[in-house]
Design a protein with these regions (language model features):
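Cys/His-rich microdomains that often coordinate metals
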Residues: 640-644, 653-656, 729-736, 746-747
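Charged, amphipathic alpha-helical regulatory modules used
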Residues: 1-106, 468, 684
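Core structural elements
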Residues: 67-72, 277-278, 460-484
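Conserved catalytic cores of very large enzyme subunits
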Residues: 90-94, 100-470, 491, 497-651, ...
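Flanking scaffold residues of small Cys/His-coordinated metal-binding clusters
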Residues: 631, 643-644, 651-654, 715-721, ...
Length: 747
């Protein structure tokens, strides 16, 4: 028996008379004569037309109405078809009016009672009155975008989950990287009617200005805010005042606690990312250092000792965690692994890789085998040679952005849906092209809107320190390539198979080519991102499962579907990290924006050497641009850090917080949305000790007495272990863009 799926998702029996009545109304509207035989014939032709769209004895109302339009036109009743289209449009407008007129009662109650998936859309938003205010304003703003700004095709594609337009709840750009050099030269302020601070003359002042700057900018943007060369730019302040290590650590501590204080909408801490050079970059080495807005009589290359002090202080504070041993969420640090990275057994190396082994805090930028250079973070607005057919890579890390660049918005394409509705590979690429066109157009519209608002003063500090969105990308991403391959009848295998991997490469290259087309068409920068998809993977899968009950999703739990992020492997595929890296290395290099390999670990690594060896092995033998080690750990309010996934404290029996990376940052698993929690349960963590690497061997760290001593001192607040760095078991766990506000452009 044939059934109809209505727009509200309900299923009702098919009724041919309803088609007849609708056609009769269209004839009547244009005073066109008709007979019962004509109506019967047209109605039967409609049923024949939509027959191939029937899935499991169910067809949607939209598919039937589309078929009516086609049949009327093909039968020569063009005027009647126009009347029918107008009839549909009028009813659609009525529905949109109802959806636009928000039900304030449900909007508030859904948040208070946590009835809506959007309450946990972002795991950084605390359930609070601030979160309620953000939820309410976000609902209004999202409706404004979909009803007043975007055209019907774009709004429909989002509402029907063909695509996901990110950050609809905010009338702002997505993410931005800022020039720390500019802040150091010019100070904080310059906005009429607002307090202005002179350039910082001391490290403590600069740390306060950075906290305030990031907090201000976070309120003008939806996503991450970033500084590059954090250690390089701060080092001269240490040198000028001849600061002691204790004084440096106090300053860095105030910065870290400052950026972790909830100070933005939704009772959130500013989403901050910093890039640390570790080694003075070549493009900065010979430049005069700047302190207090003035050039000093020494260069950045002369501040190596002070740079090491900044790095040591930062890492020690991150290792110590807060008063309860909880790891700091921000800033997310990205370290540059270059060919001249010093892998020797230094104090800072031991600290860096202990932090990596314990909390999984840092990201690593691979500048050894990837096609990036450390100076790329500063090259966007000053040295950008852009062939409009060339796709430029967005620098700055997974969440970060290079100086004076970023992204104005992100649209993610639902790949499993395309594969499911396509009968052939050709159909797949036609539908992908259509949705990419819709996505690109939506991003152009957004760029025009927020540029107008920038010029009108809605983002005063962005206007002051950036001035233009000309160097910001329009970002298109994808989700669920693994499930797309499973749903595609011409592939029918997941990402662990060669056929799926080759098809994915074909898809990514196709998308890259289309982005080049958009750059030529619109004159803007476009990039391809492996979308983090914190809530998108759940929202799209949930929508698809309701509409297409037999579509293949990632979850083994029928009531909690989700899609695998971007083109990642199934989360339960393997415990061998090198097997996963071998596959992902060929795919992640095809993205031109945020993409990362997460080495999920069940608990902390045995030693800092184990972390260092793994980081080095990946950098020297793989091309993927960004990666991170992600151990799971737990926090007890009474007893602090606990290794691995422990929901109750083994000492006091109280409930704990279990921390893991939800997409790119650590949050308590209890705060995740249902889809990501299902993913966490199905994750297979990597077993480094038993992973088989078949490439060349790199020199590995060995443990010595000095290392033992240093690591013990570093972990003095933790339970004492016989040898923290060695003992197994105990410690497991040609177009030139310039920007008038950029200090580099002014040089």
């Amino acid at each position: 028996m044939l059934n109809i799926k209505k727009r509200d998702g309900s299923i009702v029996p098919f009724n041919l008379n309803k088609i007849k009545v609708a056609i009769e109304k269209a004839f009547t509207a244009v005073n066109k004569s008709y007979s019962d035989d004509i109506i019967d014939m047209l109605a039967l032709r409609v049923t024949a037309t939509f027959n191939d769209k029937v899935k499991g004895d169910v067809v949607s109302v939209e598919d039937i109405q589309d078929s009516v339009e086609v049949v009327l036109i093909q039968s020569g009743y063009v005027e009647v078809a126009k009347a029918y289209i107008l009839y549909r449009k009028q009813h659609e407008k009525l529905r949109e009016m109802n959806s636009t007129m928000l039900d304030y009662k449900n909007t508030v109650n859904n948040y208070l009672k946590i009835n809506d998936w959007r309450v946990k859309e972002n795991s950084t938003v605390t359930y609070s009155v601030g979160g309620l205010i953000l939820s309410n304003s976000g609902a209004v703003t999202a409706n404004y975008w979909l009803s007043e700004i975007y055209d019907d095709e774009i709004a429909k594609a989002h509402r029907e989950a063909q695509i996901h337009i990110h950050d609809l709840s905010m009338l702002t750009g997505y993410c931005a990287g800022w020039s720390l050099k500019q802040l150091i030269k010019e100070g904080l302020g310059g906005i009429p009617g607002k307090i202005t601070s002179s350039p910082a003359g001391h490290l403590s002042t600069l740390c306060n200005q950075m906290v305030n700057f990031l907090g201000i900018m976070q309120n003008e943007w939806a996503g991450a805010q970033a500084f590059s060369s954090f250690d390089t730019y701060l080092a001269p302040f240490v040198k000028v005042d001849n600061l002691s290590y204790k004084e440096v650590k106090q300053c860095i501590q105030s910065f870290i606690y400052g950026v972790n204080t909830p100070s933005r909408w939704g009772t959130q801490a500013p989403f901050t990312n910093i890039t640390l050079d570790w080694v003075v970059p070549n493009d900065l080495a010979e430049l005069p250092a700047i302190v207090g807005g003035k050039e000093m009589d020494f260069k950045y290359k002369d501040c190596v000792k002070e740079m090491a002090m900044v790095n040591k202080a930062f890492i020690e504070i991150m290792i110590e965690g807060d008063a309860n041993g909880r790891g700091f969420q921000y800033p997310i640090p990205t370290y540059s692994i270059t060919r001249d990275f010093d892998w020797s057994n230094t104090e800072n190396n031991r600290l860096l890789f202990t932090m990596t082994a314990k909390y999984g805090t840092p990201y690593f930028s691979n500048y050894i085998n990837s096609d990036m250079e450390p100076s790329d973070v500063r090259s966007m607005c000053c040295r950008l040679r852009l062939d409009l057919r060339e796709l430029r890579k967005k620098s700055g890390g997974f969440f970060g952005s290079g100086e004076s660049t970023g992204s104005i918005g992100v649209v993610t394409i639902n790949m499993p849906r395309i594969a499911y509705v396509s009968k052939t590979e050709d159909e797949f690429f036609k539908e992908l092209e259509r949705l990419m066109n819709v996505s690109a157009r939506s991003l152009k519209i957004k760029r025009n809107v927020i540029t107008k608002l920038l010029d009108e003063g809605l983002y005063p500090y962005t206007k002051r320190y950036l001035g233009t969105f000309g160097n910001h990308f329009s970002t298109i991403g994808l989700v669920g390539m693994n499930e797309a391959c499973l749903n595609a009848n011409w592939v029918g295998k997941d990402m662990t198979h060669k056929e799926a991997q080759e098809f994915t490469k074909k898809v990514l290259n196709f998308m890259r080519e289309k982005l080049s087309d958009y750059q030529e068409e619109y004159g803007d920068l476009y990039n391809l991102e492996a979308t983090p998809a914190e809530s998108t993977s759940y929202r799209l899968a949930k929508h698809d499962r309701e509409r297409y009950p037999d579509i293949i999703c990632a979850s083994n739990m029928d009531n909690v579907p989700y899609y695998t992020n971007s083109s990642h492997l199934p989360v339960g595929y393997t415990s061998d990290i090198f097997s996963a890296l071998d596959i992902q290395d060929e795919l992640q290099t095809l993205y031109t924006s945020g993409t990362v390999f997460h080495a999920f670990l069940g608990q902390r690594l045995d030693s800092w050497q184990a972390a260092a060896n793994l980081v080095r092995k990946i950098a020297e033998n793989y091309k993927l641009p960004y990666y991170t080690l992600s151990p799971t750990y737990s926090i007890c309010q009474e007893h602090g850090y606990l290794e691995g996934e422990q929901y109750t404290c083994p000492i006091c029996g109280k409930k704990t917080e279990v921390y893991s990376r939800i997409t790119g940052y650590y949050r308590p698993v209890q705060n995740w949305n249902d889809g990501k929690r299902a993913e966490f349960k199905e994750r297979k963590v990597y077993d480094i000790a038993h992973s088989q690497y078949h490439g060349k061997q790199v020199e590995e760290f060995v443990c010595d007495d000095q290392a033992r001593s240093d690591v013990k001192m570093m972990q003095k607040d933790e339970p004492q272990k016989e040898c923290a760095c060695c003992q197994k078991g105990d410690d497991e766990g040609l177009l030139i863009f310039t920007t008038k506000t950029c200090p580099n452009c002014k040089m």
